[in-house]
Curated annotation (Swiss-Prot):
Keywords: Cytoplasm, Ribonucleoprotein, Ribosomal protein
Gene name in the database record: crp-74
Keyword Disulfide bond attributed: no
Listed GO biological process terms: translation
Protein name per UniProt: Large ribosomal subunit protein uL1
Assembly information from the UniProt record: Component of the large ribosomal subunit (LSU). Mature N.crassa ribosomes consist of a small (40S) and a large (60S) subunit. The 40S small subunit contains 1 molecule of ribosomal RNA (18S rRNA) and at least 32 different proteins. The large 60S subunit contains 3 rRNA molecules (26S, 5.8S and 5S rRNA) and at least 42 different proteins. uL1 forms part of the L1 stalk.
Family, similarity comment: Belongs to the universal ribosomal protein uL1 family.
Protein task: Component of the ribosome, a large ribonucleoprotein complex responsible for the synthesis of proteins in the cell. The small ribosomal subunit (SSU) binds messenger RNAs (mRNAs) and translates the encoded message by selecting cognate aminoacyl-transfer RNA (tRNA) molecules. The large subunit (LSU) contains the ribosomal catalytic site termed the peptidyl transferase center (PTC), which catalyzes the formation of peptide bonds, thereby polymerizing the amino acids delivered by tRNAs into a polypeptide chain.
Amino acid sequence: MSKISVAAVRQHVTDLLEYSNETKKRNFLETVELQIGLKNYDPQRDKRFSGTIRLPSIPRPNMSICILGDQHDIDRAKHGGVDAMSVDDLKKLNKNKKLIKKLARKYDAFVASEALIKQIPRLLGPGLSKAGKFPTPVSHSDDLTGKLNEVKSTIKFQLKKVLCMGVAVGNVGMTQEQLVGNIMLAINYLVSLLKKGWQNVGSLTIKATMSPPKRLY
């Protein structure tokens, strides 16, 4: 049972969109983040959860993605104007931790050809996994644009050592209903990951990049 009503979330979303689109309009697309504070959770003792869910609307349409591909997928990427790297490009990094870190920082996410996915740890070591950006596999039969949109609309909740986290759930260019739909799905999924459900939720806040925060819970 959700502790937050859709009506309450809708009101906060309306205020947030009004502020970002009318009161203080910025010259870039602001991301809307769901900020979560947990309670009664011990990251040392309790299981550190990790889970991903696909949202109905893409939170960050301009997210940067790089394809680590075989020739077929590199050709498809070029055709679609998407950055791509071949096995040879990856070999040139020579497992250099600094260069791999730089690569992980340059892109928001990675997609890799199915044929290549098993070679990634051997070619790049644990660098991408450590950054939480291990590639999503794509097969030749997958529609590449569809796969990229799937990656763009998937968010990840991962508990590390601290009891707070933030995930992008939308942007200020969305309609109110799109944003409310994304937020409700994200919250309900997060609660399903928690050991004691709502009893582990300390606070939930939404905030656009440059807007004041709105406390939902």
